[in-house]
Amino acid sequence: MEIKLKFLGATKCVTGSSHLLTVNEKKILLDCGLFQSNDLKSYSNDILNVDPKEVDYIVLSHSHVDHSGRIPLFFKLGFQGKVICTEPTKELCGYLLKDAARIQQEETYFENLSRHGKGVKALSPLYDEEDVELALKSFYTYGYNEEILLGEGIKVIFRDAGHILGSAICEILIKNCGESWVKLIYTGDIGNINRDILNNPEKELQGDFLILESTYGDKMHEEKDNYAKLLEIVKDIMEGNGNLIIPCFSLGRTQEIIYMLNSFIESGQVQGCNVYIDSPLAAGITQIFRKYEEYFDKKAKALIEKGDDPLNFKGLHFVENSDDGKKIYQVKSKSIIIVAGGVYDGGRIANHLRNNLPRPECGVLITSYQGNQSIGNKLLKGNKRIKLQGENIEVKGKVYYMDGLSGHADKAGLYNWVSSMKEKPKKIFLVHGEGKNIESFTNKLKSENYSVVIPDFLDEFPLEIN
């Protein structure tokens, strides 16, 4: 029995998750993600480092494109195997991968415009929406705690990762000599604890080898009451008859904020307020959440049993086309506008910021990390003027920040999850982390006598049990 593990992405970086497990002649890819942002300076999405025709299965931990985003490219290049995932992951991939295809086409179009007439070869997107549709036909779905056979002597079990809807910790069991099994656990992304809607990550697992994410291996999340903080912000703006703009992720964070706003509005703590979700993508994803209520935590299920849909309330409006979106630009008061994505110099968010930042009764709530040169960072630093699409905008509105909504476990959460294992793994491979985060968490684990490796790109290791 020969078992090897090769790291094809998310090594000393946080995108491009892809790890090749070879068991004798069978090849199983654990995630197949896109490299994004700064990681594209070092890695190329069209260099796969494995022949898709030789891969038998892709085991997908969750739908985020840094874990799923190259799957359509694999099919385009000859992959004929199966993608194994949970049902919500498949449905969410339908939205997120098509969105990724559209973004690629737009970026390629503008890049080719800049290349025109310079004698430089035109680029092509990695895949299009038709490629996504074809790929989705080969997604096979399973629930948590089911045994999934990947051929003789290999099985997979999904456990709830608590990161996003349908996210999974992947247990891979491989029949060894005699009656023994080799167990590899791949965490995907481990969720933060005590979040709304989702369960906490399943703990107390056991494995011989562990591939562990380390996104926030050197960070502790704020221990503040998210409800109290958001309620204070909403009341501050609504009592002044202003608008609150909230740029945030379409998947996960938008639904968490809707859930909290539902609590405020249905309890009467906030009155006379309209909430607009200005994102067709977020609207579609919220419908998927409603479809898979069995994946919710006990508190959310209890609300539903009482007849309260926690993702719907009077005054909640989903914007599903550009015409409706333009109408929101005219909204002047007592409205919360949730916009997909980050604080960018373009698109819907730029229009909302332009309309509301010059007004002292309005505000913007930032809920995620902002890069040093970003517009969001400039707002947090208190800049009184920002430039949006070439226009100088005076900032008179309020700027708020909430750091307690992360979907990733922090340093303590990661360590608590690892230390809940019944026995120490023989080896831990730390991935999906960079710089101080991965180094600090490595030191923490080693100080507790764990055997830890930080793999480099394309490193390969035998998984041997003596």
Describe the predicted segments one by one.
Residues M1-K53, L134-N199, D323-V331, I336, ...:
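Core dinuclear metal-dependent hydrolase active-site scaffold
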Residues A10-T11, C32-F35, P88, I164, ...:
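Active-site metal-binding loops of divalent metal-dependent hydrolases
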Residues T11-G16, V23-G81, C85-K137, I190-N200, ...:
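Pre-active-site segment of Zn-dependent metallo-hydrolases
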Residues G16, N38, S68-G69, G94, ...:
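Short helix/loop capping segments that flank catalytic or ligand/cofactor-binding pockets
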Residues K82, I169, G191-D278, G363-S368, ...:
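Cap/insert and terminal regions of metallo-dependent hydrolase folds
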Residues D99-I103, E107-E111, N226-A228, L261-F264, ...:
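Short secondary-structure boundary/capping segments
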Residues A100-I164, E293-K332:
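Metallo-beta-lactamase
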Residues I233-N372, K387:
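Hard-cation-handling environments
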